[in-house]
Amino acid sequence: MESIGELLSKRPDVRGNFDKLVAEVMKNEQVQAFISENQMTEDEIQRSYSKFYEFVKERKKFEEHEKMAAEGYEPVLTMNHGYADVSYQTTAELAARQEASSQLRRVKIIGLPKEMKHIDFYGDVFTDNQNQFDLFRKVENFIDNFPQEKGLYIYGDFGIGKSFIMAAMANELSSKKGASTTLLHYPTFISDLDFDNAKYWVNEIKKVEVLVLDDIGAEMNNAWVRDSILQVILQHRMQENLPTFFTSNLNMAELELHLAETKKTDEIWPAKRVMERVKYLASEVHLEGVNRRHE
């Protein structure tokens, strides 16, 4: 097989086209800047002609938004053992899309609207009164100091934004701290459990990085749910100091009464054991406001 040099010596027309192509490529400002930055010798430049050509051709496609083999990647020149090479790096736009996708994946929603993944902490959370603003600052403080701060037990009336601010917190933790949060509607979670899948789900939920048990106290309580599900989840999270949040229509004292009520009798001490773990994991906060669900 003939070398390029032999072919060029036999075909003046090819040589002329080649020289013209090289001259065109070498006029490219990015190629010139690369040669200057890397102080390339004449020999290195000559050995890089084909790569310079590839770069100029692919760069033109990229800048003119033509179809490329690797969408979302832009060609850049690099040095590779004495000659220029072309590599393809992620564009800022693709990197932003990938990060946005990663942020969404880090927020897991179970039994709640998926739209909660798009609630913005600073743009969407209501702070209409001092009480709401105080809660906002507590949650903001948790985010800023993550993972050192204790979780919160937020209770109050229906529709005042308890779940809303927890979703906003999860999204902000994902974007600001790269942290993963699971928001779990506790009554739905409990209603979907049975003896066959309970062990799997308890092991999954108890280990998540940040956990929000939403609407706790609204579930149908029984001894199995309280002692084999909730207690096991909270015990693990207490031992591992994993951030845990709760929302409820009940305050802590009312939740204890709810947990003590079973079909058999009032089981005060098992309920107290669970509440000791709740109190270890979270500080009680009363949220006040108007019901916004029907606005």
Where are these regions (language model features)?
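N-terminal nucleic-acid engagement/recognition segments and initiation subdomains in replication
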Residues: 1-71
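Interdomain "pre-motor" coupling segment immediately N-terminal to P-loop NTPase/helicase cores
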Residues: 55-112
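N-terminal pre-Walker A segment at the start of P-loop NTPase domains
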Residues: 111-146
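Short glycine-rich substrate-engagement loop in P-loop NTPases that contacts/grips substrate
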Residues: 127-137, 149, 155, 170-208, ...
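Walker A/P-loop nucleotide-binding motif
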Residues: 146-167
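Loop/turn-to-beta-strand initiation segments
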Residues: 179-180, 207-210, 240-246
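Walker B catalytic acidic pair
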Residues: 215-216
